[in-house]
Each structure stands twice: as structure tokens, then as C-alpha cells.
């Protein structure tokens, strides 16, 4: 089952910021420059997390992933 996620990030370095934005375009839709809506399976979510961990520096950057519930649920 696919879940809808809201993902927001704050990346300190401009080069990493561009890399995160480019990576995110493959997983969801940009709502703002650093906020994405993603409909993901569990496997896709794990791939996304892995990709982000390859790019960000955990001591300098922040990523927040909020589970909004089933994709295509109420309010669609």
C-alpha cells in the first residue's frame, strides 16, 4: 500500500541543496523549493531515505518526513 508523505528539508550547502532537490524530483512533486509531496511504497521510502543519506551531512542538514496517511485517501 502506498502512503502519502510530506517531506521538507533544510540543507546548509548550496551544492548539496541542489543534489537533494534533484534526487527528490524522482520521488514526488515539489510544493515549494524544499517541500515535496510523495506517494511511496515502503520500498520506495527506504530507497528515498538511502539516497538522501548519501547526500546530506547529518550534523549540518535537516530532513523531516511526515506520514499523511494512505495515498488517494479522503480529501483527494
What are the roles of these predicted feature ranges?
Residues 1-6, 12-76:
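Basic nucleic-acid-binding interfaces
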Amino acid at each position: 500500500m502506498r502512503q502519502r508523505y510530506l517531506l521538507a528539508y533544510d540543507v546548509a550547502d548550496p551544492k548539496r541543496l541542489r543534489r537533494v532537490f534533484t534526487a527528490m524530483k524522482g520521488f514526488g512533486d515539489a510544493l515549494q523549493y524544499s517541500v515535496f509531496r510523495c506517494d511511496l511504497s515502503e520500498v520506495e521510502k527506504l530507497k528515498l531515505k538511502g539516497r538522501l543519506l548519501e547526500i546530506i551531512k547529518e550534523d549540518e542538514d535537516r530532513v523531516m518526513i511526515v506520514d499523511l496517511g494512505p495515498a488517494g485517501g479522503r480529501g483527494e
